[in-house]
């Protein structure tokens, strides 16, 4: 913990914050590791149903800015705890409701609402607890801890499925365990007794003509994120028959690769500039999408499955290039407040496109 002591203020509640965050990430890893298979194999969701479920799962991300405007008098710690309470409610509901589409989607929406509320506060609290001039490394440590928590969840799901075999009876117990872990994280979060101010820039939309290209980039990133995050794993489950063990292993490999590649991508942005990185990202993405969509026409089925898995991981890695757009905004901004406000608006634009793509993508898959 020596590294943490060098980065964070000793009078802050950074330890309770990080312990709660890693437990929330662990619970998410367990939950996400089985969710796609649960929806396909137990709930019986079709491709279009999956799009509908993702519409409601992403909707809280778009609504977040309105929620923060309502609770603007709350401290960042209080909003973070509120998000944890909502996450617990959503996961408990997922644990007890029967596999009925409406109830399952409602539980997903509630959990996602809490998740997005916390997502909006994590950076604020990290920067608040960091020592002067240590904000960058503090954010990096926060991201690493969160990735490790999710990775642990994926590895646990892989191990359980490996030893228990291919059985759908594991899904509900996983949701129950995730609920208990979330409850533990909630308990730790109650030890965060500070009164950090929320970022005022996150309470309003901020549109300026000079950032029009950035908003268009967020439209692009929101669409590509939703296509791969939502329908990428579902292709592997429905078309190639991947079970929860394979999906959780894929998520784990993806998390490890992103964890390792994130600093490298950051250095490449600094060295070559954001324009070169964004162009490289787009060129590589064209090949990734082509192979993901047409691999089964080019290769034997087993080989095509491996190609799709590799492309899923590759897309996760190259999506890190979206950091370049933040550097682009910083270069154009006249102040740090304008940077934060623009990026926050970009996040809302990103989620708006995500929820529309979820429905449109599901309709296309179902129709074709």
Where in this protein do the model-derived segments appear?
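C-terminal membrane-cytosol helix-exit motif in multi-pass small-molecule transporters
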Residues: 157, 161, 179-198
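Hydrophobic core of transmembrane alpha-helices in multi-pass small-molecule transporters
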Residues: 22, 90, 102-118, 302-320
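C-terminal ends and interior cores of transmembrane alpha-helices
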Residues: 85-99, 283-301
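Cytoplasmic helix-loop-helix junction between adjacent transmembrane helices
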Residues: 109-145
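Glycine-rich segments within core transmembrane alpha-helices of 12-TM secondary carriers
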Residues: 140-158, 347-357
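Helix-to-loop junctions at the C-terminal end of transmembrane segments
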Residues: 63-76, 161, 261-274, 362-366
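Short amphipathic helix-loop junctions that connect adjacent transmembrane helices
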Residues: 33-49, 230-247, 329-331, 366
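Intracellular juxtamembrane helix-capping segments at the cytosolic ends
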Residues: 117-130, 319-334
């Amino acid at each position: 913990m020596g590294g943490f002591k060098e980065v964070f203020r000793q009078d802050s509640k950074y330890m309770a914050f990080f312990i709660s965050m890693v437990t929330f990430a662990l619970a998410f890893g367990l939950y996400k590791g089985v969710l796609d298979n649960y929806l396909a194999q137990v709930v019986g969701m079709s491709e279009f149903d999956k799009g509908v479920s993702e519409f409601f799962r992403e909707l809280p991300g778009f609504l977040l800015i309105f929620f923060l405007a309502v609770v603007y008098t709350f401290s960042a710690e209080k909003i973070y705890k509120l998000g944890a309470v909502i996450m617990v409610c959503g996961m408990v509901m997922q644990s007890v409701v029967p596999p009925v589409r409406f109830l399952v989607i409602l539980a997903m929406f509630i959990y996602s609402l809490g998740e997005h509320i916390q997502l909006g506060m994590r950076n604020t609290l990290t920067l608040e607890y960091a020592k002067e001039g240590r904000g960058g490394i503090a954010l990096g440590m926060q991201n690493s801890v969160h990735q490790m928590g999710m990775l642990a969840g994926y590895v646990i799901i892989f191990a359980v499925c490996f030893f228990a075999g291919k059985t759908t009876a594991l899904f509900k117990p996983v949701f129950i365990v995730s609920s208990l872990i979330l409850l533990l994280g909630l308990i730790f979060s109650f030890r965060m007794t500070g009164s950090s101010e929320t970022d005022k820039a996150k309470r309003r939309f901020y549109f300026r003509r000079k950032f029009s290209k950035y908003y268009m980039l967020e439209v692009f990133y929101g669409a590509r994120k939703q296509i791969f995050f939502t329908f990428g794993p579902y292709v592997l489950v429905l078309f190639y028959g991947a079970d929860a063990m394979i999906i959780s292993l894929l998520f784990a490999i993806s998390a490890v690769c992103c964890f390792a590649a994130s600093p490298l991508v950051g250095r490449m942005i600094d060295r070559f500039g954001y324009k070169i990185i964004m162009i490289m990202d787009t060129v590589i993405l064209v090949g990734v999408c082509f192979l993901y969509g047409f691999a089964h026409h080019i290769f034997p089925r087993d080989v095509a499955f491996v190609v799709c898995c590799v492309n899923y991981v590759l897309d996760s890695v190259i999506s890190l290039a979206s950091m370049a757009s933040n550097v682009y905004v910083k270069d154009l901004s006249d102040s740090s407040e304008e940077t934060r406000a623009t990026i926050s608006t970009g996040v809302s634009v990103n989620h708006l496109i995500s929820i529309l793509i979820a429905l449109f993508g599901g309709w296309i898959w179902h129709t074709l």
